[in-house]
């Protein structure tokens, strides 16, 4: 099946994947652009998993000041080489993550960064609220687990839905950029400032 060059170009622009990868994905999905994007995303995640163990000693400190100067973000985004750290695509990712932090106010990079006491307290509050509503203990436990998962999605940057596409998380976004740039990428830390907070 001959693949339309315009479709290949569109898919490349949407995913950042190479021409041959785009062409192959379109052929495998019968020319369906949405399915091809999904296929490349899945492959990108597979590529990202292979790179996950590699050290990230280079990177940038990115600053973002929201319009009006009332909200600011400092972000440390790491990669493997200074070549990628200077790349505009890497800087674009840093800006996207900083926008996310400014808008969604995460408190931690990942759930591993949350102190154990905070997790236990949130779980206990959710359990006690369910019991107060008259739920049996085993049901209250399930409700608490569900509320903890929701809590993680609110306070952990990597688990938050991406503000520009809520079908993917920030972790998914980073994996897409890992596939584009061919290096492991990691958010090390961030700080969000807001006037009056």
UniProtKB/Swiss-Prot annotation:
Q: Name one GO cellular component term.
A: cytoplasm
Going by the UniProt record, its keywords in alphabetical order are: Cytoplasm, Elongation factor, Protein biosynthesis
InterPro entries in the record: EF-Ts_dimer_sf, Transl_elong_EFTs/EF1B, Transl_elong_EFTs/EF1B_dimer, Transl_elong_Ts_CS, UBA-like_sf
> Superkingdom, according to UniProt?
Bacteria
Annotated segments matching region Involved in Mg(2+) ion dislocation from EF-Tu: 81-84
Recall the GO molecular function terms of this protein's record: translation elongation factor activity
Location of the protein in the cell: Cytoplasm
Q: Which residues form a coiled coil?
A: none
Xref: Pfam families: EF_TS
Q: Which HAMAP family match?
A: EF_Ts (MF_00050)
Protein family membership: Belongs to the EF-Ts family.
Function comment? Associates with the EF-Tu.GDP complex and induces the exchange of GDP to GTP. It remains bound to the aminoacyl-tRNA.EF-Tu.GTP complex up to the GTP hydrolysis stage on the ribosome.
Spell out the NCBIfam families in the cross-references.
Answer: tsf (TIGR00116)
Q: What is this protein called?
A: Elongation factor Ts
Q: Which organism is it from?
A: Persephonella marina (strain DSM 14350 / EX-H1)
Gene from which this protein is expressed? tsf
């Amino acid at each position: 099946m001959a693949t339309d060059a315009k479709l290949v170009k569109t898919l490349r622009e949407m995913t950042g994947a190479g021409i041959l990868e785009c062409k192959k994905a379109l052929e495998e999905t019968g020319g369906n652009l949405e399915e091809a994007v999904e296929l490349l995303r899945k492959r990108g995640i597979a590529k990202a998993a292979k790179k996950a163990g590699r050290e990230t000693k280079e990177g940038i400190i990115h600053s973002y000041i929201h319009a009006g100067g009332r909200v600011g973000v400092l972000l440390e985004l790491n990669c493997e080489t200074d070549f990628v750290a200077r790349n505009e695509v890497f800087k674009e990712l840093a800006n996207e993550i900083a926008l996310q932090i400014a808008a969604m106010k995460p408190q931690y990079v990942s759930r591993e960064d949350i102190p154990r006491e905070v997790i236990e307290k949130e779980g206990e509050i959710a359990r006690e609220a369910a019991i107060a509503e008259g739920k049996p203990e085993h049901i209250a436990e399930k409700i608490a687990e569900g509320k903890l998962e929701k809590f993680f999605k609110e306070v952990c940057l990597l688990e938050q839905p991406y503000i520009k596409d809520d079908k993917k998380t920030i972790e998914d976004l980073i994996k897409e950029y890992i596939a584009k740039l061919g290096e492991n990428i990691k958010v090390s830390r961030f700080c969000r400032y807001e006037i009056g907070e």
